[in-house]
Curated annotation (Swiss-Prot):
Disruption phenotype: Reduced light-mediated transcription of CHS, CAB, HYH and HY5. Impaired influence of blue light on hypocotyl elongation. One of its GO terms (cellular component) is nucleus. It comes from Arabidopsis thaliana. The keyword Transmembrane helix does not apply. It holds the Pfam family TCP. One of its GO terms (molecular function) is DNA-binding transcription factor activity. Signal peptide: none annotated. Induction: Repressed by the miRNA miR-JAW. Induced by blue light. Stabilized by light but labile in darkness due to proteasome-dependent proteolysis (at protein level). Residues 130-202, 220-245 are annotated as: Disordered. GO terms for biological process: leaf development; positive regulation of photomorphogenesis; positive regulation of transcription by RNA polymerase II; regulation of DNA-templated transcription; response to blue light. This is Transcription factor TCP2. Interacts with SPL. Interacts with CRY1. Coiled coil: none annotated.
Length: 365
């Protein structure tokens, strides 16, 4: 078809004026051109043309086969622009185009209307650009507000972190102080035992005699009385009948601080004496002034059988009642040369129902 058109074109030297008049409608009808303002932005900045089906792009996309034929025709015609080759094709097909139905029923705007449309288009484009600018400004304001809120959140988070750090530091300091106080109190057994006795009362009377130094100033302490306690023993009875050695007694309490037993009124008057047998370590005896009526004595001794003879200590009793009954306690430790044995100190009560004469007979040597 393209070859036939070219042959016909070569045969005809002059083009009819009527054909030129028909083509002039397309060449000089500027009212159908829609120009796009550059302010609107985007890639599609070239003008469009108004057709019966609305504005259309001036650029045409061709298929692969049509594009090959078209560019071959353009090269054969010697045109440097594709639009000139399209114009030549339209002129060559004028007869066939005239046979097609007309578009008289289609209303196209005149030049005045086109100018008005261009003005409206420009105004619309300007309004779009202003709205875009305003939206950008609003977005920037919103972003600034968000940034402010983020900064406030960060400040609050930092403040909370500082508070947590200060709290943890305070707790660590408190724990360190408590540990230091515990060490200091452990270095002073008299004060620690005083605090322990004052803060930890118990129904068992022997809990107050777990240390050799309980009360160092002759203070009077009231303890609960338990008369229904059952006597128990962890060491055989022959230990009590073993002959005692001579001991030297040392008092931990000055004599002028020891109040008379009769003025206690049933309260405990604690006196501590250290007995030092020859090569047998040390023993401390504590006697109560009264208040217990079901116990004879308690003895803390080692399980090592070869040291029983040299370990028994002298008991000292301070009767406060007419019957002279009251608990007596004995504490002792093995010599240093026998420390390789499995030392386990045990405390026992026995003979809780003995009379006062037996107490007096066994309490003194």
């Amino acid at each position: 078809m393209i070859g036939d058109l070219m042959k016909n074109n070569n045969n005809g030297d002059v083009v009819d004026n009527e054909v030129n008049n028909r083509l002039s409608r397309w060449h000089h009808n500027s009212s159908r051109i829609i120009r796009v303002s550059r302010a609107s932005g985007g890639k599609d900045r070239h003008s469009k043309v108004l057709t019966s089906k609305g504005p259309r792009d001036r650029r045409v996309r061709l298929s692969v086969s049509t594009a090959l034929q078209f560019y071959d025709l353009q090269d054969r015609l010697g045109y440097d622009q594709p639009s000139k080759a399209v114009e030549w094709l339209i002129k060559a097909a004028e007869d066939s185009i005239s046979e097609l139905p007309s578009l008289n029923n289609t209303h196209f705007p005149t030049d005045d209307e086109n100018h008005q449309n261009q003005t409206l288009t420009t105004v619309a484009a300007n309004s779009l650009s202003k709205s875009a600018c305003s939206s950008n400004s609003d977005t920037s304001k919103n972003s600034s507000g968000l940034s402010l809120s983020r900064s406030e959140l960060r400040d609050k988070a930092r403040e909370r972190a500082r508070e947590r750090t200060a709290k943890e530091t305070k707790e660590r300091d408190h724990n360190h102080t408590s540990f230091t106080d515990l060490l200091n109190s452990g270095s002073d057994p008299v004060n620690s035992n005083r605090q322990w006795m004052a803060s930890a009362p118990s129904s068992s009377p022997m809990e107050y005699f777990s240390s050799g130094l309980i009360l160092g100033s002759g203070q009077q302490t009231h303890f609960p009385i338990s008369t229904n306690s059952h006597p128990f023993s962890s060491i055989s009875d022959h230990h009590h009948h073993h002959p005692h050695h001579q001991h030297q007694e040392f008092s931990f309490v000055p004599d002028h601080l020891i109040s008379p037993a009769e003025s206690n009124g049933g309260a405990f008057n604690l006196d501590f004496n250290m007995s030092t047998p020859s090569g047998a370590g040390a023993a401390v005896s504590a006697a109560s002034g009264g208040g217990f009526s079901g116990f004879n004595r308690g003895t803390l001794q080692s399980n090592s059988t070869n040291q029983h003879q040299s370990f028994l200590a002298n008991l000292q009793r301070f009767p406060t009642s007419e019957s002279g009954g009251g608990p007596q306690f004995l504490f002792g430790a093995l010599p240093a040369e026998n420390h390789h044995h499995n030392h386990q100190f045990q405390l026992y009560y026995e003979n809780g129902c003995r009379n006062s004469s037996e107490h007096k007979g066994k309490g003194k040597n």
